[in-house]
């Protein structure tokens, strides 16, 4: 149990996918202008990333490795992620039309989020078992969502601030992301891998 807790804390804070591994930067910069959209993207990513992580692990363990097709991992994982996103979109549309309208634009964007593919590939490279893959996928998504919501809240405050003209827009956003990355480096001694 302690190993799973360390994996959770380590992935969310110490080895954050956005601020440490630099995966998922496109949605991080593009969808984080408003807090509501960041929360919607974070919620959708959490569900999809956890499910895709488990499905990719199962496909790797039960299909690719036994058949000696490990060289097809990346292509197969991309297909698995696309299927999971489509399945999620259909399930959400059927069960909760209100949630579908809220998350509708974000679900197709998750297919192109490199963090989802990164989690699937890192699960294989780190030889995680089923439960570790689920925890790793969930904690990567929680870390992604946490950073995205924090960044969106900061960007909303910056929109109201008196920022010098040369730093407005993408410049101040990148400076803020760098400062957040430095802040998260403070967690580096929290968990030793």
Swiss-Prot record:
One of its GO terms (cellular component) is plasma membrane. Disulfide bonds: none annotated. It comes from the Bacteria. The keyword Lyase does not apply. Coiled coil: none annotated. It is a multi-pass membrane protein. One of its GO terms (biological process) is electron transport chain. Its EC number is 7.-.-.-. The chain crosses the membrane at residues 5-25, 39-59, 62-82, 102-122, 134-154, 171-191. Pfam families: Rnf-Nqr (PF02508). It is found in: Cell inner membrane. Keywords: Cell inner membrane, Cell membrane, Electron transport, Membrane, Translocase, Transmembrane, Transmembrane helix, Transport. Belongs to the NqrDE/RnfAE family. PANTHER family: INTEGRAL MEMBRANE PROTEIN OF SOXR-REDUCING COMPLEX, ION-TRANSLOCATING OXIDOREDUCTASE COMPLEX SUBUNIT A. Part of a membrane-bound complex that couples electron transfer with translocation of ions across the membrane. The complex is composed of six subunits: RnfA, RnfB, RnfC, RnfD, RnfE and RnfG. This is Ion-translocating oxidoreductase complex subunit A.
């Amino acid at each position: 149990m302690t190993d799973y807790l360390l994996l959770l804390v380590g992935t969310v804070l110490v080895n954050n996918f956005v601020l440490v591994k630099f995966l998922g930067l496109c949605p991080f910069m593009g969808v984080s202008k408003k807090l509501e959209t960041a929360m919607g993207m974070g919620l959708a990513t959490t569900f999809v990333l956890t499910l895709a992580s488990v499905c990719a692990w199962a496909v790797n363990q039960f299909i690719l490795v036994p058949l000696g097709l490990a060289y097809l991992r990346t292509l197969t994982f991309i297909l698995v992620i696309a299927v999971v996103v489509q399945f999620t979109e259909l399930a959400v549309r059927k069960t909760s039309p209100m949630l579908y309208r809220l998350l509708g634009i974000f679900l197709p964007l998750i297919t192109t989020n490199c963090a989802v593919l990164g989690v699937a590939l890192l699960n294989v490279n780190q030889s995680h078992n089923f439960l570790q893959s689920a925890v790793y996928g969930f904690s990567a998504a929680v870390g992604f969502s946490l950073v995205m919501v924090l960044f969106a809240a900061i960007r909303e405050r910056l929109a109201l601030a008196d920022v010098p003209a040369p730093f407005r827009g993408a410049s101040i956003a990148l400076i803020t992301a760098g400062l957040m990355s430095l802040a998260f480096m403070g967690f580096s001694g929290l968990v030793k891998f």
